């Protein structure tokens, strides 16, 4: 009779729920064996579910594949809402039918998985571009226009250049055909890939700014208006990376000028 360890090693090789190996092992009454069978079945089902989820997130890409297009860039940004730091956009071209396990809207990926999935995108992407527009430009042109500039910069870095753009809720004035998708980072794998690249890139920048400007908790809040950030603003004032067109930073700057 096989040991439970041997059965466990055998089950790792099973890839289908209908495998005859399950039927054979289910005759074994040992609770440890039954536990391993259940565990492996759950793992196989999870893999099937994940594959279906990834498949559903390729629907926009597959429509474009049918038209003979393969160089499809997903575009997304991170950092529209913070009081400090840049807006960062990424453009990513994935290989045809590329599925990266765990890839999703960056807001839905557990923080501890960010770097792992970011690295998987880096490893598998055909091309990646990153656009960073700082707070001074944001204050000059407004955050909406700055976001467009960041996206255009990211796209300009792609080589080869894309045949079509899938963009998260935005239209760009570029001579490339494009599709604007509401909640694109949750509905397109290409946009989701751009989402995690932009997110990790910006988070790393904000960690560097946290070293440069301690007291605002930038490493944790990424420039968003958390209680610790607002406390830092009150105690320490405005830094060179704060967006002076955003409240409450704007009022703090005006108050300082008037005093």
Curated annotation (Swiss-Prot):
SUPFAM superfamilies (UniProt xref): Ribonuclease H-like (SSF53098)
A single MF term (Gene Ontology): manganese ion binding
PROSITE patterns tied to this protein: RNASE_H_2
Cellular location(s): Cytoplasm
Residues covered by the RNase H type-2 domain: 70-258
Reactions accelerated catalytically: Endonucleolytic cleavage to 5'-phosphomonoester
Alphabetical list of Pfam families matching this protein: RNase_HII
Protein name: Ribonuclease HII
Organism: Streptococcus pneumoniae (strain Taiwan19F-14)
Gene that this polypeptide is encoded by: rnhB
């Amino acid at each position: 009779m096989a040991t439970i360890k041997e059965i466990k090693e055998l089950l790792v090789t099973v890839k289908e729920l209908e495998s005859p190996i399950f039927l054979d092992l289910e005759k074994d009454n040992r609770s440890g064996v039954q536990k391993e069978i259940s565990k492996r079945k759950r793992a196989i089902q999870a893999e099937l579910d994940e594959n279906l989820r990834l498949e559903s997130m390729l629907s926009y890409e597959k429509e474009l594949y049918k038209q003979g297009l393969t160089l499809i860039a997903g575009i997304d940004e991170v950092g529209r809402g913070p009081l400090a730091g840049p807006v960062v956009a990424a453009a990513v071209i994935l290989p045809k039918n590329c599925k990266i396990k765990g890839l999703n809207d960056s807001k839905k990926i557990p923080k501890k998985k960010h770097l792992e999935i970011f690295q998987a995108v880096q490893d598998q992407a055909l091309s990646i571009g990153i656009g960073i527009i700082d707070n001074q430009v944001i204050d000059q042109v407004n955050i909406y226009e700055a976001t467009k500039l960041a996206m255009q910069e990211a796209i300009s870095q792609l080589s080869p250049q894309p045949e079509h753009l899938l963009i998260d809720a935005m239209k760009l004035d570029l001579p490339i055909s494009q599709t604007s998708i509401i909640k694109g980072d949750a509905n397109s794998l290409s946009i989701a890939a751009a989402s995690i690249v932009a997110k990790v890139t910006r988070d790393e920048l904000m960690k560097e700014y946290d070293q440069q400007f301690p007291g605002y908790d930038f490493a944790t809040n990424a420039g968003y208006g958390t209680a610790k950030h607002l406390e830092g603003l009150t105690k320490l004032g405005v830094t060179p990376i704060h967006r002076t067109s955003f409240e409450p930073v704007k009022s703090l700057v005006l108050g300082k000028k008037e005093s």
